[in-house]
């Protein structure tokens, strides 16, 4: 748990999804609208089940998702669950500052234990948290049991290769593209396997997420948004505000180039996406 005990160490601006062009691209691939985030897809996919009266967000972190759910009218009440006491404390403070404590609550708890004691939920949501869990078939069985028969599973997740599944083919593809970028944009000599050695739960069984979901749930909608190229390459791009960094135009141009390659790759192999948004109901 020590890795997640300091939420401030995980830089928001370092995430590839937060580049404006990338965010618009993801939104368009999932919702069809570059201005609408994936969570805004729910009213279109399951309009007859909203708002969710009782929802739980697993791995809530600092609480951004829960506040958005309330503000969009997707939930009546939502409980955020996270194993990090520090993250839960910050999420509570943010909910209080937004005046949302009557509709958002937080629990510092083990997700397995929490779900095993919970029944009758209208929704269970995961945002970049499910890929930290192992024994996925068992865990998603707990999620299914915690949901009502018409409950909804929502996930926005990394579903690509697990941490031990990277091959030389992945490295070859990434490094060929990386070497083709302007030298001013390249911060490192090569792209290495994207393994977070500080966090042994990162992508622990990620490639098993979709098969485990399909075992316990009926998928109502799925939106793939890649990350096969950008996710491993983006951390090695030199930012415009760094020492000897490229111009903003050069940096954004490199990102746009990678987005074009990403789009082309997904078009040729639609099932290969490393990231997906899934809306499903219990079988």
Locate each region found by the language model:
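A conserved beta-strand element that flanks and buttresses the S-adenosyl-L-methionine
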Residues: 125
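Class I SAM-dependent methyltransferase SAM/SAH-binding core
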Residues: 63-64, 68-101, 105-113
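Conserved alpha-helix/loop element of class I SAM-dependent methyltransferases that forms part
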Residues: 21, 31-52
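N-terminal, positively charged/glycine-rich alpha-helical extensions of SAM-dependent methyltransferases
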Residues: 1-26, 36
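Substrate-binding/catalytic lobe of Class I Rossmann-like enzymes that use SAM or dcSAM, i.e.
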Residues: 183-242
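A short glycine-rich, Lys/Arg-flanked "PGG" loop and its adjoining helix->strand segment in the class I
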Residues: 137-152
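Conserved class I S-adenosyl-L-methionine
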Residues: 51-61, 152-183
């Amino acid at each position: 748990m020590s890795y997640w005990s300091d939420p401030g160490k995980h830089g928001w601006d370092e995430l590839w999804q937060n580049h404006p062009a990338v965010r618009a691209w993801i939104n368009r691939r999932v919702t069809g609208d570059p201005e609408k985030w994936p969570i805004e897809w729910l009213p279109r996919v399951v309009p007859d089940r909203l708002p969710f009266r009782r929802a739980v967000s697993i791995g809530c972190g600092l609480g951004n998702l829960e506040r958005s759910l309330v503000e969009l009218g997707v939930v009546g009440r939502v409980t955020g669950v996270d194993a990090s006491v520090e993250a839960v404390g910050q999420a509570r403070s943010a909910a209080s500052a937004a005046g949302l404590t009557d509709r958002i609550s937080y629990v510092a708890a083990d997700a397995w234990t929490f779900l095993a004691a919970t029944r009758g939920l209208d929704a269970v949501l995961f945002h970049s948290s499910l890929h930290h869990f192992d024994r996925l078939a068992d865990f998603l069985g707990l999620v299914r049991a915690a949901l009502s028969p018409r409950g909804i599973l929502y996930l926005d997740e990394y579903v690509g290769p697990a941490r031990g599944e990277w091959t030389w083919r992945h490295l070859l593809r990434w490094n060929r593209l990386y070497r083709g970028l302007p030298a001013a944009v390249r911060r490192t000599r090569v792209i290495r396997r994207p393994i977070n050695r500080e966090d042994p739960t990162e992508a622990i069984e990620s490639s098993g997420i979709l098969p485990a979901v399909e075992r316990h749930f009926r998928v109502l909608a799925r939106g793939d948004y890649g990350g096969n190229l950008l996710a491993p390459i983006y951390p090695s791009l030199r930012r415009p505000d760094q020492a000897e960094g490229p111009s903003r135009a050069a940096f954004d141009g490199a990102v746009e180039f990678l987005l074009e390659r990403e789009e082309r790759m997904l078009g040729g192999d639609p099932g290969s996406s490393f990231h997906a948004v899934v809306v499903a109901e219990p079988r």
